[in-house]
Regions:
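Class I S-adenosyl-L-methionine
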Residues: 1-65
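Glycine/threonine-rich flexible loop motifs
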Residues: 100-106
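A short SAM/SAH-binding and catalytic strip from SAM-dependent methyltransferases
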Residues: 91-100
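Conserved acidic residues
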Residues: 26, 88, 157
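A short acidic, Gly/Pro-enriched loop at the edge of an enzyme's catalytic core
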Residues: 80-90
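Conserved Class I SAM-dependent methyltransferase catalytic core
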Residues: 16, 107-168, 173
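Catalytic phosphate/metal-binding cores of nucleic-acid and nucleotide-processing enzymes, i.e., regions
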Residues: 13, 89-92
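S-adenosyl-L-methionine
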Residues: 60-82
Length: 174
């Protein structure tokens, strides 16, 4: 699985969107939407929801779900989205360590690049809900370094650790 495309389990997707307390008027972006597991909850609230997915098969599924996805590499989402898309909330479950096949190496830095680009697009004062592997947590050196780097742009208010077994039935474990 070159791009590390593992769908977010529905219960985890629901929890993330619930905790963000989405409101009428919010503009939502899911920059690496995959099967739309996160975006469907925002869309169910009738919020303006934008999806992006690089994989053509998953984009087709997003279209079936009623989205009009763009097809950019989420690592560069801020560079390519039209200026009118200025989300008040970003929901994401980026690849934890995959480069999308561009290099032979995997590193959590690739997933962090997705996060940085989405953060750059987030409206000032907006909300950001993200699912990361353990390497993205504050208690890992890599994660701590990353969050310190972006701390001027975002305030971490809550971290929930989820047992990797929640992902087994979706084809992966963290």
């Amino acid at each position: 699985i070159i791009r590390q495309q593992f769908s977010t389990p529905p219960a985890i997707a629901y929890l993330l969107t619930y905790l963000l307390n989405l409101k009428s008027g919010d503009q939502i972006l899911e920059p690496s939407a995959g099967t739309g597991s996160l975006a469907v909850w925002a869309n169910g609230l009738h919020l303006e929801t934008y999806t992006n997915e690089i994989d053509s098969r998953r984009r087709k599924l997003l279209e079936v779900l009623g989205f009009n996805p763009t097809a950019y590499d989420a690592e560069f989402i801020n560079d390519f989205l039209p200026p009118a898309i200025s989300p008040t909330c970003v929901l994401m479950n980026p690849p934890f360590s995959s480069s999308g096949g561009r290099t032979k190496n995997n590193s959590s830095k690739f997933g962090f690049r997705h996060v940085e680009s989405a953060l750059a697009r987030l409206k000032k004062g907006g909300k950001f809900g993200i699912i990361l592997s353990e390497a993205g947590g504050l208690d890992s050196k890599t994660g701590n370094d990353f969050w310190r780097k972006v701390s001027d742009r975002i305030e971490v208010k809550l971290i929930i650790k989820i047992d990797g077994r929640e992902y087994y039935k979706n084809g992966s474990a963290t």
